[in-house]
Design a protein with these regions (language model features):
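N-terminal low-complexity/intrinsically disordered extensions
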Residues: 1-18, 402
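Patatin-like phospholipase
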Residues: 14-22, 28-131, 135-137, 174-186, ...
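Flexible loop/turn segments at secondary-structure boundaries
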Residues: 28-30, 68, 232, 255-258, ...
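Alpha-helix termini
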Residues: 42-52, 145-150, 304-313
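C-terminal helical/tail subdomains of lipid-metabolizing enzymes
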Residues: 124, 301-403
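Active-site periphery "cap/insert" segments of enzyme catalytic domains
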Residues: 124-162, 169-173
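Active-site gating loop/helix substructures
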Residues: 153-245, 249-250, 255-274, 278-279, ...
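Acidic, Ser/Thr-rich peripheral helices and adjacent loops at domain boundaries
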Residues: 261-301, 343-344
Length: 403
């Protein structure tokens, strides 16, 4: 990450801090974010009498973009919006997100199921049909409420990222309070002012090989987009560009992959499910902590400069709090994978993705109550374990150009 993309112009001294929320992607795993945010809402209620929505800048990638946009639509309701997100996830089922392409004999035969997958892959370059998710999002997200939250000043900006298969560029689509053009462009990364739609969310959450790409109109032409986690080298950058002084970033990565490492195949060769899960991890989870560390280094560099030098620099320090699962989500998925619809279980079984390290693949697709509730409970427990740190993050102190 470059310093110019990370710490743009410093705000006026003493201005109230702008809180940003960055939500990373990860399919069903992002239910963890809903649990964590609900627990944060409970902490803030206990700490003060304020019920205001705690974030002014919302950015999200993949399923994290769905969460961010849902929250934007509920921001006028204050802290209740965090509870609404948790309730949304509690009601989710796999059939409301995707289904396997079907043939008349699919429910009787694994071969018929495989044939449906092959036909879908040829027609849509994707294994699953995600039309159900379109319907779910239209019912759950009132897009007009986002505009109302922006006009009222409750929100300053909402941003959703997606990766263009057509051009290879990683795009950030921004809907802001002032509606002005978004000024940043970097090699391989662009930003554009657009009202966020369900199509943007489908594009951002189109997991490669799993869900079909989505066409979006951008830069004067139509391009096909897939999951925003692909080629996302700087997940915190858009929140900083949009004015966040303090950023809470919630990922859904794997803390200790070694938890499942001992359950190897007898011949030592990884299954297709293991390889696919490893590939998914490289797409979704390898950039956030590196970005947080880079911000910490830049903050340190700015803070050791003499006051006279800092006063001349058009940069600012940005406070970041990162929250990641404290337990293995892969192992958690292994306990619940058999609750998926039977046709999907058959496919995962054929890929070797029902046990051991292969269960990582299932964790992205497991939109079933047991797994969702376990993820949300983990998010709530992790917030409670760090409650003092989180409450300190939300203290209403003023922000100086360099902290």
């Amino acid at each position: 990450m470059h310093i110019d993309s990370l710490t743009p112009q410093a705000p006026p001294s003493g201005h109230p801090p702008v809180n940003g929320l960055v939500l990373m992607g990860g399919g069903a795993r992002t239910a963890y974010q809903a649990g964590a945010l609900q627990a944060i809402g409970a902490l803030l209620r206990q700490k003060s009498h304020s019920r205001h929505f705690p974030f002014q800048v919302l950015t999200g990638t993949s399923a994290g973009a769905l969460n961010a946009t849902f929250l934007a639509s509920k921001a006028m309701g204050g802290l209740n919006g965090l509870d609404d997100l948790a309730n949304f996830w509690s009601a989710i089922r796999t059939e409301a997100i995707y289904h396997l392409p079907s043939t008349p004999l699919a429910k009787f035969s694994r071969w018929a199921t495989a044939l449906g997958l092959v036909l879908s892959a040829r027609q849509q370059a994707a294994a699953m049909d995600s039309l159900a998710l379109v319907n779910t999002l239209h019912k759950a997200i009132a897009l007009d409420k986002i505009d109302a939250a922006l006009r009222s000043g409750v929100l300053h900006a909402l941003a959703v990222t997606a990766s263009s298969y057509s051009s290879g560029i990683h795009w950030t689509f921004c809907q802001t309070r002032d509606g002005l053009p978004i000024p940043w462009s970097r090699p391989g990364r662009r930003a554009e002012q657009q009202p966020i739609t369900i199509e943007h969310l489908m594009a951002s959450s189109a997991i490669p090989f799993i869900f079909p790409s989505t066409p979006l109109w951008v830069d004067g032409g139509m391009e096909y987009f897939g999951d925003g986690s692909m080629r996302q080298i700087s997940p915190l950058s858009s929140a900083v560009h949009l004015g966040a002084d303090r950023i809470l970033a919630i990922g859904v990565g794997q803390p200790q992959r070694a938890n499942l490492a001992g359950q190897r195949n007898g011949n030592g060769r990884p299954s297709l499910g293991t390889i696919a899960g490893h590939a998914m991890a490289s797409v979704f989870h390898d950039t956030l902590e590196a970005d947080v560390a880079q911000i910490a280094r830049i903050n340190l560099s700015l803070n050791v400069l003499p006051d006279s030098v800092r006063a001349e620099l058009p940069f600012r320090a940005v406070e970041v709090l990162s929250l990641q699962p404290s337990a293995s989500l892969d192992a958690l998925a292994q306990d619940h994978v058999h609750t998926l619809p039977r046709p999907i279980v058959r496919v995962l079984e054929g890929l070797g993705a029902l046990q051991g390290s292969g269960a990582a693949l299932a964790s992205y697709l497991l939109f079933e109550p047991g797994f969702i509730e376990a993820l949300m409970s983990l998010g709530q427990a992790d917030v409670k374990a760090r409650s003092e740190e989180i409450l300190a993050f939300f203290e209403p102190h003023s922000v100086d150009p360099v902290r």
